[in-house]
């Protein structure tokens, strides 16, 4: 039996022990045994200690160090619940952070009480730019600060009573963790995507196929005649991880390259708000595009919010169309093919100009020596020559993000001074560059059809280009016509429908060798390198020729070295011509190594980039299943047990994965997409049994609160704002200033954070849990109001009073067996059924409402002593929401074991059936009265009751209805 925090061992009266005599002022006159913040603090502290000592939430694995020591089998009925793990910032938690954590804890506790083996753990996503920036500002090493932050987060989370298996917690910065991040990187690096098999395969199998002659080189060369270096180049070009000279988002102010998702819509860094420039650099890339179809198609088997699925579908962006080859002439006189991709090949006859992305590889080759005679000044951008105009335009758009370029309403561009031949008409069309065409989508070149594409129409109008109608039905003098119609001005396509024309022109392009049917995606390969310090080092070294070599798995982990200067080389934020200089380049002893990679001891240099902050979160769910495994990232048996497909439970298409994943929708096209990609590669290579990482996803809403800004729009600390005379003032350093109230997401940026420590101190953790769960559906954002927290506290006080006499501490429960009245039994079993259904569906707010209703019923119905048979089920039902209070009451009721493993009460179906039914009575469609009849009353009895109702009779005023309609169990309608 565990010792109660509020009872002296051996005492039967429940007299408090260790509770200070001076309680807070608000409750100084309260009865000695009332459920107060101080009593709650003692209860919570002791039960948290008990849970930790007893390992209450520790769950067994089938194999390994967490398997049952006696060799017993693990339960078949299991559940894996996971939260998006937090970044341990220096500010600690605010009350918005625990919303999802509490919700999943309620869900996990409920299912644990139902007898399921529940895995619920929480780690920390601790690598990344924020810790590095803080370290640079303060001179504190990122690891020192991060570890201190993790300790504080664990303390704050521990106060909430979350039922996590603490043995499974880790940080992505733990060497034992990122060793396996590096290992997974090597698995992806040493793999290639077999398009015919639609899966990844080991790179060794590709080499074997080339060696045997089973596979030929696409360029026609003979594999057997290639040098070792040439063979390595071929293999490197097939890898799922590769280096490429690609356009990247270079941020001089941060000294690093950013992924597209880390750049805001106005072309600035998400962190720091620095300008970001498009720049060509050699970078590590991950070939996520190889999985475009599978990432898209497998969304159909996931139980995810439609919003997130739509965001991923749009981000992947599958488009069906055709490629077409326009021929042009280089500046040296050579003919070159300009390939475009279009979803509207039917409009090819209407293509009156071409547009290339300013970064397109062929732009410099196609720039004319001078402007053709009679060139329109609108085309030249004010440049004396095409080369000058192109250079100036590139400089002007370098600061724009991809999103800003696509959404810009003002269409700009410059003429290259050269033309290409339209394969449909045989006529020359001018070639432009413009920022609304992106190098990363399609071929980086488009055929412009201003008559039937609004962006092209806007561009043509701005630069005075011709507009040709090829689909009848609109007025192209006013706007582009994008509807259906019959083809016109299109040669052999005239008279065809749009669908017929698409097929016909695609077939003609294929037969003439000028194009083919094609599918394109918006998704780009993943830029997988950062010029920072605080991240996972790459398990890659370079030889004297600069060729990369993967380290053997036995060389892992490649540990991040401690260096005296870990700050990146920062540049003038506006210096677009600066070049990255990673901090790890300063660690010379670590950088230069001698290794034997199979051909003798040779000098190598390590890669000085680090992995992006998304690396650890792309696989961390797997490590929860086997956190101490030193030989594998996780044992296959453990992954299969926790994450394997369960078709009997979820249907034949069940992809497997975590049973419930809860986190913010802001990660839809970042973490969630990257995690799916890594998981699919591991699945293809046979390392996991599940083909998706997360079977079910729920996005929790935000907790919002008032924030305040001064006249400049800068936020001021909300807790220091004073409301006065209908307005708000802030006591600044130079006196009071007027501030303006707004409503937004709670957090440090708006300076309106409220610490959960503050609420726990004032009310107790169980009160915070109940309040946050009662605020609304988990998916909805909700306003925080500290003044409303007291309502949750008073509810728990009422539950406490049903069991404990506030004056004496004695148990009030009636143990004498007595026959319960029907109303009490009906209230009990309806509460059980409703609360259980709500917990299972994560409707915690309505579960709270039902528990309050049942508590109020017991308070009114049983004023002296509540029968044990109806109070114990209440304690069990409250346990997922307020576990500390429930454990304490459960023990005081005489139980010697924790209720964490149940059993959760079961409802008796006999008491869920109504004896009576209330019918609204309508007269000509409007409700005029209500009648209550027996649940088994037939239509005649219902009609009679409706006609006999005094309110209905008064409204009828003696008139007889022409028709009486009874909708069984729902309503009666009298037609007069």
UniProtKB/Swiss-Prot annotation:
GO CC annotations, alphabetized: cytosol
Ranges of Low complexity composition bias in the record: 1-23
BP GO terms, sorted: leucyl-tRNA aminoacylation
EC number(s) per entry: 6.1.1.4
Region (Disordered): 1-34
Catalytic activity: tRNA(Leu) + L-leucine + ATP = L-leucyl-tRNA(Leu) + AMP + diphosphate
Motif 'HIGH' region: chain residues: 86-97
Keywords: Aminoacyl-tRNA synthetase, ATP-binding, Cytoplasm, Ligase, Nucleotide-binding, Protein biosynthesis
Subcellular location: Cytoplasm
Predominant localisation class: cytoplasm
Record: residues binding ATP: 748
PROSITE patterns found in the cross-reference section: AA_TRNA_LIGASE_I
Name of the protein: Leucine--tRNA ligase
Gene, per the UniProt record: leuS
């Amino acid at each position: 039996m565990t010792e109660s925090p509020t009872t002296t061992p051996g005492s039967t009266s429940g007299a408090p022990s260790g509770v200070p005599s001076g309680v807070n002022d608000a409750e100084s006159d309260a009865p000695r045994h009332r459920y107060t913040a101080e009593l709650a603090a003692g209860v919570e502290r002791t039960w948290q200690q008990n849970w930790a000592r007893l390992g209450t939430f520790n769950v067994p694995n089938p194999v390994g160090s967490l398997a049952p020591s006696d060799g017993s089998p693990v339960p078949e009925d299991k559940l894996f619940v996971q939260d998006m793990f937090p970044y341990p910032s220096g500010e600690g938690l605010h009350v918005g952070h625990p919303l999802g954590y509490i919700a999943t804890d309620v869900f996990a506790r409920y299912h644990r009480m139902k007898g399921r083996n529940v895995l619920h753990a929480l780690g920390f996503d601790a690598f990344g730019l924020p810790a590095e920036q803080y370290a640079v500002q303060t001179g504190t090493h990122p690891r020192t600060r991060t570890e201190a932050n993790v300790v504080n987060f664990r303390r704050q989370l521990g106060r909430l009573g979350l039922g996590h298996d603490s043995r499974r917690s880790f940080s992505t910065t733990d060497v034992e963790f990122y060793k396996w991040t590096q290992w997974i990187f090597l698995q992806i690096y040493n793999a290639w995507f077999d398009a015919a098999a639609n899966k990844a395969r080991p790179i060794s199998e590709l080499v074997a196929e080339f060696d045997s002659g089973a596979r030929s080189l696409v360029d026609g060369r003979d594999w057997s005649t290639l040098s070792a270096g040439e063979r390595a180049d071929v293999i490197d070009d097939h890898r799922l991880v590769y280096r490429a000279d690609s356009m990247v988002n270079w941020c001089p102010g941060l000294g690093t390259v950013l992924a597209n998702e880390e750049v805001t819509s106005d072309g600035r860094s998400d962190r720091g708000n620095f300008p970001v420039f498009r720049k060509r650099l050699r970078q590590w890339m991950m070939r996520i595009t190889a999985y475009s179809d599978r990432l898209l198609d497998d969304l159909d088997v996931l139980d995810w919010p439609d919003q997130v699925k739509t965001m991923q579908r749009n981000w992947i962006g599958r488009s069906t169309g055709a490629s077409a080859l326009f021929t042009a002439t280089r500046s040296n006189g050579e003919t070159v093919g300009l390939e475009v991709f279009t979803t509207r090949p039917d409009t090819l006859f209407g293509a009156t100009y071409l547009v290339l992305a300013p970064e397109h590889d062929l732009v410099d080759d196609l720039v004319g020596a001078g402007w053709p005679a009679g060139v329109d000044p609108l085309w030249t951008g004010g440049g004396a020559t095409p080369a000058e105009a192109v250079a100036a335009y590139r400089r002007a758009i370098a600061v724009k993000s991809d999103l800003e370029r696509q959404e810009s309403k003002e269409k700009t561009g410059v003429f290259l001074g050269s033309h290409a031949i339209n394969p449909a008409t045989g006529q020359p069309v001018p070639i432009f560059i413009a920022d609304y065409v992106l190098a990363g989508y399609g071929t980086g070149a488009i055929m412009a059809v201003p008559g039937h594409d609004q962006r092209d129409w806007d561009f043509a109008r701005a630069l005075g280009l011709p507009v040709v109608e090829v689909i009848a039905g609109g007025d192209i003098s006013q706007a582009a016509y994008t509807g259906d119609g019959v083809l016109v001005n299109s040669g052999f396509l005239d008279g065809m429908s749009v669908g017929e024309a698409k097929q016909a022109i695609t077939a003609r392009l294929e037969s003439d060798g000028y194009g083919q049917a094609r599918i394109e995606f918006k998704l780009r390969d993943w830029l997988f390198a950062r010029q920072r310090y605080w991240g996972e080092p790459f398990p890659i070294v370079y030889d004297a020729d600069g060729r990369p070599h993967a380290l053997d798995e036995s060389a892992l982990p490649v540990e991040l070295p401690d260096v005296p200067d870990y700050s990146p080389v920062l540049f003038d934020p506006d210096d677009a011509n600066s070049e990255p200089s990673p901090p790890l380049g300063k660690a010379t002893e670590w950088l230069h190594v001698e290794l034997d990679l199979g051909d003798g001891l040779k000098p190598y240099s390590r890669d000085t980039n680090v992995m992006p902050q998304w690396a650890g979160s792309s696989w961390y769910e797997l490590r929860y299943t086997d956190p101490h495994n030193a030989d594998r990232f996780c044992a296959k048996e453990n992954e299969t047990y926790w994450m394997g497909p369960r078709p009997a439970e979820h249907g034949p298409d069940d992809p497997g994965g975590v049973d419930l994943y809860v986190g913010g929708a802001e990660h839809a096209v970042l973490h969630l997409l990257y995690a799916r990609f890594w998981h699919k590669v591991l699945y293809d290579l046979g390392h996991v049994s599940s083909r998706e990482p997360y079977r079910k996803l729920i996005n929790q809403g935000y907790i919002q609160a008032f924030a305040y800004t001064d006249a400049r729009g800068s936020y001021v600390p909300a807790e220091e704002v004073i409301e006065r005379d209908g307005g708000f003032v802030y006591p600044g350093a130079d006196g009071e200033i007027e501030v303006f109230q707004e409503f937004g997401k709670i957090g440090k940026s708006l300076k309106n954070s409220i610490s959960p420590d503050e609420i726990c101190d004032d009310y107790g953790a169980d009160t915070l849990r109940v309040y946050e769960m009662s605020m609304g559906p988990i998916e909805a954002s909700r306003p925080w109001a500290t003044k409303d927290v007291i309502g949750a506290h008073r509810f728990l006080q009422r539950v406490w009073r049903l069991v404990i006499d506030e004056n004496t501490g004695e148990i009030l429960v009636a143990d004498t067996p007595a026959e319960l009245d029907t109303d009490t039994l009906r209230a009990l079993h309806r509460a059980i059924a409703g609360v259980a259904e709500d917990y299972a569906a994560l409707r915690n707010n309505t579960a709270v409402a039902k528990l309050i209703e049942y508590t109020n019923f017991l308070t009114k119905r049983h004023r002296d002593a509540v029968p044990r048979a109806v109070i114990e089920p209440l304690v069990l039902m409250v346990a997922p929401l307020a576990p500390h209070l429930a454990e304490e009451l459960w023990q005081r009721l005489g139980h010697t074991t924790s209720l964490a493993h149940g059993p959760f009460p079961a409802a008796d179906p006999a008491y869920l059936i109504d004896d009576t039914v209330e019918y609204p009575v309508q007269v000509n469609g409007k409700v005029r009265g209500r009648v209550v009849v027996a649940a088994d009353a037939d239509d005649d009895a219902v009609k009679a009751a409706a006609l006999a109702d005094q309110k209905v009779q008064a409204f009828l005023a003696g008139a007889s209805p022409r028709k009486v309609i009874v909708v069984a169990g729902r309503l009666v309608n009298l037609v007069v």
